[in-house]
Structure formats: C-alpha cells, structure tokens
Amino acid sequence: MTPVFLLEELQKFISSKTSDIILPVRTRTGSNEEKERAAAVYKMGLPEADDVQQKVPYILLKFLTGTDDKKAGEPEEDSCKVRIIFAVYSEDGQDGPLALLNLILRVRSELKKAGTIGGGQFALELPLEYI
C-alpha cells in the first residue's frame, strides 16, 4: 500500500461523502468571502501556516504510522494509521460541537459502509477510533 495513494483516495472519498454538509465559515470583517460551504479536505497539512483558522471548516488527513507485514510466499500486506482532523466554526456554543459531531459521524458511517476505497485497493481495519 502506498500511503500517498491512500491519502489521495481518502481525500476524494471524504470530499464526495461530505459535500452536502454546508457549514458556517469564519469571515473577516468587510470581506466578500462566502459565509457557508462544505468542509475542504486537505492531505498532511494546510496550504499556509496561518490557515488553521482561515480555512475552517476543513478536514485534514495525516499519515501517522505504517507497517509492512509481508511473510515469505504471501502477498504483500501493508497497513497504516491515518488521523482525520476535523475543524468547524460557529458563533453558537451548541451548534459548533453538533456540526463537528455530525461531520465526524458522517465520515465514520460512510467509511464503515464502504469497507474499502480506491476501487477495493484499500481496506478499512476495524475498530475505528474517534475522540
């Protein structure tokens, strides 16, 4: 398994499964930025250092660890752990956490339902851990 390809497939999968969840955007005073949009999905990092707040809402995919478990005479079996970081914005103390939970649960549900991504190239290993 190539972690780069996995992150690319995860990005496509998560973008398509969350595109209908429209969330508030933190806008600068006097700007003509859109006030709502779906969460953007990024791999490994945000485009700019100060984007932690400016790009909200977003989902960030980070490769954590990888394991090669190939035994003699068996097909190659690699695995890796990916952390999925969710960020949302809300001026309301209840709406923000609920929007965050909704986004997390949508991704979790769609991953479990699919079982694999990338045309079956990447299989999900249970259990999923989320906090």
How should each PLM-predicted stretch be described?
Residues 20, 98-131:
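Acidic-leaning, charged glycine-interspersed low-complexity segments
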Residues 76-92, 105-107:
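Oligomerization/assembly interface segments of phage tail-like spikes and tubes
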Residues 70-71, 91-97:
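A generic structural signal for short coil/turn motifs at secondary-structure boundaries
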Residues 1-74:
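Small/polar-rich, solvent-exposed N-terminal microdomains that initiate assembly or binding
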Residues 58, 81, 100-104:
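Generic internal hydrophobic packing segments that stabilize the cores of diverse globular domains
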Residues 4, 94-101:
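Ordered, soluble secondary-structure elements with a strong preference for glycine-centered loop motifs
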Residues 62-67, 84-90, 111:
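Generic secondary-structure microfeatures
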